[in-house]
Amino acid sequence: MISRLFGKNKAGFCENSRLISFRYSPGYSDMRGAMHSEELTRNENGGWITVCRDRDSHAEPVVVTVYSVSDAAAEDFTSFLRKSGAASLADRRKDDLFATDYSPWEYEMEFDPPRSGSGRRYIRICEYRKYSKRDYALIRELNSRFRAIRGEKISETVEPD
C-alpha cells in the first residue's frame, strides 16, 4: 500500500517535501490498554513541539504532556530524515511473524509535497517488516535522534474520558 501512495522513491520524496509531523509509538504486548505515543508537530503559533500521550490501562485517563522543540533541533532532525534514507525502510518486505494481540512499534512521517494540491503523504515504518542489521542500526539512530530533540516541558493535562 505504501508503494502505491508514494512510488518507489520515498527518500527522494522526503528530500523535496516539507515535514508536517513525525510520530513514534513503541508498541505493547499486553491487553490492559496501556499506550504511549510521541509526535513532533507544530503548535497553533507555528513553533515545533513534541506531544506525548500516555495511559497505563483502559481504566486510566490519557495524560498529554507537551514539550518545546527548538527550530534548530527540528531542522537537524528533518535533515537527518532526508539524508539518512529512513523513509526507504517502509519499502522492506512484510515479515511472516504477526501477532494479532500485540500492538507493533511504528514510526510515521507526514510530509507536504512541494506541488500544491497534491495532498499530504504518509510514510510508515513498522515492526512487521524484514529489516537487516544495518536497517536496525538506522532505526536505533532514528529513535535516538527523535528523543534528543525534546526540550522543556510546557504543559501536562489529563484528557477527560
Where does each model-flagged region fall?
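A short, structured loop/turn motif at beta-sheet edges
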Residues: 42-44, 69-76, 109-118
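A short-motif feature that recognizes glycine-rich, charge-decorated loops
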Residues: 51-90
